[in-house]
């Protein structure tokens, strides 16, 4: 699933091609994605001008002058590309938003876990209402994590992936951040010290910023809007490396399932 760096990479790739463009039309080839596409998409987008493209957590918002924003989530396997308008659709190309300049914003989603919804300009969509702070913001600190974790018995990895705690940190970057901070993913969230949470917050910020710089992580599904892969996969320390040697100490990495998610860590470097 695309995580924050992949969505940020998508945002940065799309924004120069979209902002200021007038929307010519909308084609819905498959309106039943994770949720049905609301009627406002077909009714309000044609004729509207795109005023901004932004990200909140793993969601993209395409702001318009039509009184609201298109709200997109890439799901497990979705991608957005800006293409010449005469590019023939492929399998799983479910939505086209055609632009005044003759190009088209195309949403492809093989598994259909993504979504295209509408957020009124006067309201915050319910999917965004209860989200935690952005991990690269000043609001996300070790002190914040430590205070919120008090009394929590869930594994610290599960805690870190809770979108009400902090947004955009999924399985890949939670595993990598915990390894850099030297914290076992199995440790109870409420038993991690303030000093270690400060290291963890710093690790999250550093790893996410570097992953964005490297264009995200290309595993099975993600490609950037220009079709290029993300290169952070080459930098992974633990994620997807079960049974291999820890790059830090050389010991064999461990594997377990935490919160129904595969987890790899070093039993020596992470305590």
From Swiss-Prot:
PROSITE patterns on file: FPG_CAT, ZF_FPG_1, ZF_FPG_2
Residues that coordinate or bind DNA: 92, 111, 152
This enzyme's EC code(s): 3.2.2.23, 4.2.99.18
Enzymatic reactions: Hydrolysis of DNA containing ring-opened 7-methylguanine residues, releasing 2,6-diamino-4-hydroxy-5-(N-methyl)formamidopyrimidine; 2'-deoxyribonucleotide-(2'-deoxyribose 5'-phosphate)-2'-deoxyribonucleotide-DNA = a 3'-end 2'-deoxyribonucleotide-(2,3-dehydro-2,3-deoxyribose 5'-phosphate)-DNA + a 5'-end 5'-phospho-2'-deoxyribonucleoside-DNA + H(+)
Cofactor, free-text remark: Binds 1 zinc ion per subunit.
One GO term (biological process): base-excision repair
SMART domains linked to this entry: Fapy_DNA_glyco, H2TH
HAMAP family given in the database record: Fapy_DNA_glycosyl
PANTHER family in the cross-refs: FORMAMIDOPYRIMIDINE-DNA GLYCOSYLASE
Role noted for this protein: Involved in base excision repair of DNA damaged by oxidation or by mutagenic agents. Acts as a DNA glycosylase that recognizes and removes damaged bases. Has a preference for oxidized purines, such as 7,8-dihydro-8-oxoguanine (8-oxoG). Has AP (apurinic/apyrimidinic) lyase activity and introduces nicks in the DNA strand. Cleaves the DNA backbone by beta-delta elimination to generate a single-strand break at the site of the removed base with both 3'- and 5'-phosphates.
Protein name as it appears in the record: Formamidopyrimidine-DNA glycosylase
Annotated organism of origin: Xanthomonas euvesicatoria pv. vesicatoria (strain 85-10)
